[in-house]
A protein has these predicted regions:
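Extracytoplasmic electron-transfer domains, predominantly the class I c-type cytochrome c fold
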Residues: 26, 33, 37, 41, ...
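Surface-exposed loop and turn segments in beta-propeller and other repeat-based domains
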Residues: 184-199, 249-262, 299, 308-329, ...
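Sequence/structural segment immediately N-terminal to covalent heme-attachment motifs in c-type
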Residues: 40-61, 83-91, 148, 152
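Beta-propeller blade signature
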Residues: 233-243, 291-308, 363-364
Length: 484
């Protein structure tokens, strides 16, 4: 306490001295050097203020994308004319985007701003910064970032036992990288269904059967138009590759959904397939406790567990509850963009919150994760609604972020190439274009390090057979983090 009082006394003397000095000094005009910062004409547009207040939380600063998609690139799902953009702003799209009660003049200003951002982006590539050529130094490891290949709107990758990599492109193609080179021809014959309006997203995640070396099964999640109305149908399919062709195609599961970006898959040691299906609930009109993510009869906002052929296991937690979907393993999830097992067989999930509240969770059988009633973020509506961060009977995250980095996929590192990374969890970020290394002890975070920042929106993360960490970005880069 004495030190604190002495500090205040010293501060008081300093303030007095400054005041006295100012009193004895003649007043004079301050001459400042002219600013060298060029004004940004786009940021000065009337629509910029409206966008920053109402839209940037989802779509990122200058519309480059965060949790929501970029509005400054060539991928337009709901049309690219001024009328299309205005219609989307005014009417929204259930359940992903709220309708906004703007005046016609405000909508005109917003459309003009989005148009200006798009034109500016054509001149300067905002999406992919230069891959660093120098060695990256982190707390316990040094590495170089190498570009393996480039793609168009990729989503996920997996390595085959022979070292080749399969990469999905959301427009509906499956590509092959062999010995560090992208093969010119895509895999043919994958039934991708009716193309979504605009380029959209069709083929998403990919996984190999645990006995792939014997049976050759490859699993995909595919988004298709919903013939019954708005939204999509999400499918889990499997097939085999013979030569350069997709064969033996089977549909194992399908469900209507409003989310076309959150279907991740992972197999456990027993050969069960786990799949995530999101529910953002941005504009869900009913009471939060009645949201689809908390409704056991609805697949959205869930982690699902199935046999390798799509059947529901008899020991799933809700198989004996009338009306419940027998595939449900856990519920109350928002946007699950990553799923992975650690070396002990524990299932982990990375999840986008709304305004804040991004999470990494341990997924437990039959557990409730709370969304949208319980979250460390804020719900999106015309105005944000605050939910409770904790509630009895609801699981708490192991890691939580605020503000939100828009976390994406994740992977555990178990190789010896970077020995001091062993057992660490790597999580990608779309908003900050980062890669996080998380050190865990007894299933609790003890350290978090940002090992890479600013290259591009990280969409997928994995570890290759060579022990290197691989990243796939929205800008089309397939990157390798190799020892320096």
């Amino acid at each position: 306490m004495k030190h604190w009082i002495a500090g205040l006394a010293g501060a008081g003397l300093f303030i007095f001295a400054v005041a006295a000095f100012g009193a004895d000094t003649p007043s004079r005009a301050i001459v400042r050097a002219p600013s060298t910062v060029k004004p940004d004409p786009v940021s000065a547009l009337p629509g910029a203020k409206i966008f920053n207040e109402h839209c940037a939380g989802c779509h990122g600063a200058r519309a480059v994308g965060a949790e929501g998609p970029s509005l400054s690139d060539e991928y337009w799902i709901h049309g690219r004319t001024d009328a299309d953009i205005g219609k989307a702003i005014r009417g929204g799209f259930d359940p992903k985007m709220a309708a906004f009660d703007f005046t016609d003049a405000q909508i005109t200003d917003l459309v003009a701003y989005i148009r200006a951002v798009f034109v500016a982006t054509l001149v300067v590539d905002r999406s992919v910064q230069a891959v660093p050529a120098d060695v990256q130094h982190t707390e316990v490891a040094d590495f170089r970032v190498e570009t393996v290949a480039k793609f168009t709107a990729p989503y996920a990758f997996v390595f085959l036992p022979d070292g080749r990599a399969l990469i999905t492109e959301t427009a509906g193609t499956l590509r092959v990288v062999d010995k560090g080179k992208l093969l010119p021809e895509a895999i043919e014959g994958i039934p991708i269904g009716t193309p979504l309006q605009g380029p959209g997203r069709r083929i998403l995640n990919i996984a190999l059967h645990p006995d792939y070396a014997k049976n050759g099964w490859i699993y995909l999640t595919i988004a298709d138009n919903n013939p019954a109305g708005r939204g999509f149908v999400m499918r889990v399919v499997r097939g085999k590759i013979k030569g350069s062709r997709w064969t033996d195609h089977q549909v194992l599961f399908e469900a209507p959904t409003g989310e076309a970006s959150t279907a991740r898959m992972a197999f456990d040691r027993q050969g069960y397939l786990f799949m995530t299906l999101g529910f953002s609930g941005n504009i869900y009109p009913g009471p939060p406790e009645d949201a689809p993510s908390l409704d056991l009869s609805d697949p959205n906002g869930k982690v699902l567990r199935m046999h390798d052929d799509g059947r529901a296991p008899a020991d799933n937690p809700f198989v004996n509850i009338p009306g419940a979907l027998k595939l449900v393993w856990s519920y109350g999830h928002r946007q699950s963009l990553g799923i992975a097992f650690d070396s002990k067989g524990t299932l982990w999930e990375s999840e986008n919150g709304a305004r804040g509240g991004d999470e990494v969770n341990i997924i437990k059988k039959g557990a409730n994760y709370g969304w949208p009633v319980v979250t460390w973020g804020h719900r999106y509506d015309s105005i944000p609604r605050v939910a409770m961060p904790e509630m009895e009977g609801v699981e708490q995250p192991v890691v939580s972020w605020a503000p939100s980095p828009a976390v994406s996929a994740m992977a555990f590192y178990e190789s010896d190439v970077f020995p001091r990374w062993k057992g660490n969890l790597f999580v990608g970020s779309m908003k900050y274009r980062s890669l996080y290394r998380i050190v865990l002890k007894e299933n609790r975070q003890v350290l978090q390090e940002e090992v890479l920042r600013g290259i591009d929106r990280v969409r997928d993360v994995g570890v290759g057979p060579d022990g290197c960490v691989y990243l796939l970005t929205d800008g089309g880069l397939f990157l390798r983090l190799a020892p320096a």
